[in-house]
């Protein structure tokens, strides 16, 4: 893993979480890094949904948790997830992106996917405070709207 410091993002940030976490997050007024070094966000709803496609929507796929232990993604239930649209409050801390590193000879397709994955996420080193009353989007509804949008093909 290679972290790269970036400028503080401008505008809104998006963070997906399980519905069961919402009450505590709203009471707390912050997204906590928990066992990680950073808490992670996306710059748009579209990026958030794509990140979810590459992670929590990959039922049964292997990943490594924050303790470095191998795990498998459980069955994805869209109704269990929400996306918070956040206005960050000013605070000190480093903003980073995480650049996936690959061994020499890694297939180009895998490298491109890793680059996309790395640039979907924006990390904040610390707990990110946000202004009250963030918009909360239902992931099930977002996915339904996404599939109903007309697809233009050429």
Regions picked out by a protein language model, each given a short descriptive name:
Residues 1-40, 53-56:
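ADP-ribose/NAD+-binding catalytic cleft of ART/PARP-like enzymes
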Residues 38, 44, 84-86:
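Aromatic-enriched hydrophobic runs in primary sequence
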């Amino acid at each position: 893993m290679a972290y790269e410091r970036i400028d503080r993002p401008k505008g809104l940030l998006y963070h997906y979480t399980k519905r069961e976490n919402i009450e505590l997050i709203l009471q707390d007024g912050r997204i906590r890094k928990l066992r990680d070094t950073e808490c992670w966000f996306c710059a748009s709803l579209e990026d958030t949904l794509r990140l979810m496609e590459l992670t929590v929507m990959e039922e049964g796929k292997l990943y490594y948790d924050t303790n470095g232990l191998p795990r498998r993604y459980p069955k994805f239930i869209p109704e269990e997830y929400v996306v918070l649209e956040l206005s960050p409050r000013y605070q000190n801390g480093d903003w980073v992106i995480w650049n996936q590193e690959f061994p020499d000879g890694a297939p180009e397709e895998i490298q491109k996917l890793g680059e996309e994955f790395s640039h979907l996420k924006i990390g904040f080193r610390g707990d990110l405070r946000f202004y009250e009353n963030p918009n909360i989007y239902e992931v099930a509804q977002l996915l339904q709207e996404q599939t109903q949008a007309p697809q233009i093909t050429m």
